[in-house]
């Protein structure tokens, strides 16, 4: 069955999701988008992308529609989600990717207006369930869960790596740092911002800031609740990030044993979400990689029962591919 999707917020994640649908061949049809930007600009930004390159097909727009190839879909510009009638366009699932409606009590408006399910492309509040594909997606219950969070890109990287280690060695506690590409909420030049570190010019600074990824791990791996914490270092690249995780585990081990356990998980239960590599890669090598986490075996360090590992991730493309997977998964039980 084709899953019909509406996208609220056609920014970086909204457009990456659209491209990922096309690239994956998933049985998903985008029937409408809602964004306050004019349609001509939206079409241009979909057609030309500084990271992904030119869209492989014709893209055009009118005042009411965007056309990609031979497929047209509605484009609305409603500030208030309450004015969106998703039932009129037949949307089964709405991707909430504006960044403004991360509280499920607000995002639920999409369901009130005709969508069967709502997926928030960010960490959320009051959601029915937070899902990281490959880690806890089997907890999804179509009867109970209407508003779902896809967690953050960093949690999607951290969780598979942590699960692989915890399942074999039992994580006691740990700290993580995400070396993260700059994002749209930072400044190009120094200027006012609620976070005074993020107020500084993104392209010429390493910017320490907060991340909720480590604490959020307890939402998808309850046995690790309260056992991880960390922060982010935003760096001057537009995409391509890395999560550095250091944990104490239940027994002494070796780097070889840790790598073997992660490799087994990447080839087994976490295949497609966790990828294992022994190549000496850098961040640009994983741009457009669809995996949630690319485990870098060459960076594994072990001292007794202390384990340090690194996983790369394309914080836009990898995350958007998980949205495609989640839509497909949820769509099976509509």
Region spans (language model):
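Alpha-helical scaffold segments in soluble metabolic enzymes
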Residues: 12, 16, 20, 44, ...
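Acidic, glycine-rich segments within the central catalytic cores of soluble metabolic enzymes
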Residues: 167, 171-238
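Short, solvent-exposed beta-strand edge segments and adjacent coil->beta transition regions
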Residues: 144-145, 201-203, 240-244, 306-308
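Generic secondary-structure signature for well-ordered alpha-helical cores
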Residues: 22-26, 163-171, 181-184, 211, ...
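C-terminal active-site/capping subdomain that shapes the small-molecule cofactor and substrate pocket
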Residues: 230, 242, 246-334
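N-terminal Rossmann-like NAD(P) cofactor-binding subdomain of oxidoreductases
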Residues: 1-199, 301, 325, 333-334
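Hydrophobic alpha-helical scaffolding
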Residues: 151-152, 206-208, 248, 313
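Short clusters of hydrophobic/aromatic residues that line enzyme substrate/ligand-binding pockets
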Residues: 66, 131-133, 147, 188-189, ...
């Amino acid at each position: 069955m084709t899953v019909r999707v509406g996208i609220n917020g056609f920014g970086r994640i909204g457009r990456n999701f659209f491209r990922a649908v096309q690239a994956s061949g998933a049985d998903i049809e985008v029937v409408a988008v809602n964004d306050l930007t004019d349609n001509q600009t939206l079409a241009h930004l979909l057609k030309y992308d500084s990271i992904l390159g030119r869209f492989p097909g014709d893209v055009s727009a009118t005042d009411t529609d965007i056309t990609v190839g031979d497929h047209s879909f509605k484009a609305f510009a409603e500030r208030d989600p309450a004015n969106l009638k998703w039932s009129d366009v037949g949307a089964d699932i709405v991707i909430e990717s504006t960044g403004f409606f991360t509280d499920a009590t607000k995002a639920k408006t999409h369901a009130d207006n005709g969508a069967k399910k709502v997926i928030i492309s960010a960490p959320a509040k009051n959601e029915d369930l937070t899902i990281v594909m490959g880690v806890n997606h089997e907890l999804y219950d179509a009867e109970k869960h209407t508003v779902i969070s896809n967690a953050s890109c960093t949690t999607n990287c951290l969780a598979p790596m942590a699960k692989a280690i915890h399942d074999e060695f039992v994580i006691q506690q740990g700290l993580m740092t995400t070396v993260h590409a700059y994002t749209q909420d930072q400044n190009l030049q120094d200027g006012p911002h609620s976070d005074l570190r993020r107020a500084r010019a993104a392209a010429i600074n390493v910017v320490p800031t907060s991340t909720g990824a480590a604490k959020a791990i307890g939402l998808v791996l309850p046995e690790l609740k309260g056992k991880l914490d960390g922060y982010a270092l935003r760096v001057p690249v537009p995409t391509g990030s890395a999560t550095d995780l250091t944990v104490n585990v239940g027994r002494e081990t070796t780097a070889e044993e840790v790598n073997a356990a992660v490799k087994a998980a990447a080839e087994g239960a976490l295949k497609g979400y966790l990828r294992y590599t022994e190549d000496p890669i850098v961040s640009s090598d994983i741009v457009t990689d669809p995996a949630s986490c690319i485990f870098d075996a060459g960076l594994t360090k072990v001292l007794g029962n202390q384990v340090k590992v690194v996983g790369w991730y394309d914080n836009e493309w990898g995350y958007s591919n998980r949205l495609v997977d989640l839509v497909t998964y949820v769509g099976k039980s509509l």
